[in-house]
């Protein structure tokens, strides 16, 4: 690896380290929203099946 590639890699790792907590928080929120959406769809299916 050249020194330029090393510098780019170091900068990239620095950015990743800075973003890691934000990404973790966002992942938790997205996971929660996805689970909520799936549960809503399942409940809607069940209720739809009952009423139809």
UniProtKB/Swiss-Prot annotation:
Spans traversing the lipid bilayer: 11-31, 32-52
Keywords annotated in UniProt: Host membrane, Membrane, Transmembrane, Transmembrane helix
UniProt subcellular location: Host membrane
GO cellular component: host cell membrane; membrane
Superkingdom, taxonomy of origin: Viruses
Membrane topology field: Multi-pass membrane protein
Protein name: Transmembrane protein ORF52
